[in-house]
């Protein structure tokens, strides 16, 4: 009988170790249930998606206004009797503006906040787009395009800082990928609009003025997006920051990250580890965007040089390349989390260079080969295209984040100004093959630089990625 009771006790009573684990599990679950989450740990909500969507609008406008000028120039040049120098100046003027706008806009955004600049720039872009319709001389168009570039450039650090500071870490690459995809979407829409208006008398006026439409849509969508709580907290406005967190995330979410970043003077960007990061970003972004900007700004001319037709046919060729850029950015959003930032960047640069080398070494190839080579380059531009926005926002603290984005993007635009001005001249002097080889050389330079300097930031909070002892 005693043995039966003992056996029953052994069956019913769990082992001591199992009971301890069960108790420990209960305690852990209670701790997790009562512990507050940080902004990095929450799930994406419809309002957070709205912030990402409308913050990406500035990137859409950049792709739109930059690409549409390539189509518009095919009408503007004969209408105004422009030389290659004037054509190049019109194409490059927006990039000069972007250079000035990214640096000044980033600095002002860190001083007066994301929200105010978020609205001002859209109003200005719409105004100067309208003025472009009424220009009577080439210099007036250069001036209007310059100021459009200033405010498009200012939107880069504003919008991407806002996205980075609102988005949970697991969704940051996808949200920033939306910025890159929006650029390519804007360029693709521009090609479609340009194709539709190409046959109209004074169609170029409608093309340039059409940028007002997305400006109005974005203004409506942005009007209720709040100030960044991280920026507010960095300025000592903790009560306002807490109110924004309660409104957007809920009262159970903590304002400060688990590992808060220290105060970072602006001068810190110009020395030590942050200077190293700044140099990497400036050169990496330059190598990524210079060939792309040249292709978009003078797309119809480049397509014609490859024998893909002229007029509507060349615009269709540019549209096909734009579609490859857009499609390539979609899987890259997810590869940045699954593969990591660094491996995807290295793989992408290698395959981009391969496509450009084919174009440079075999410019007389069959049309199918030309399209596939352009497609290879454009498709794998998706990863670097996202990282040009993601890396600057991850690698610098809140106090100087927008400034860092502005300086990095602005530095890269020095190369795009020279390349965009020089592309029509180089096409005329050298031909399309050597121009593509120069582009391939730039991409290979980006590959080598990234091999030695590109960091891995996957799965880390902004406080961790912006610290100087993470790598």
Predicted segments, located by residue:
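Transmembrane-helix signature of 12-pass secondary carriers
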Residues: 2-471
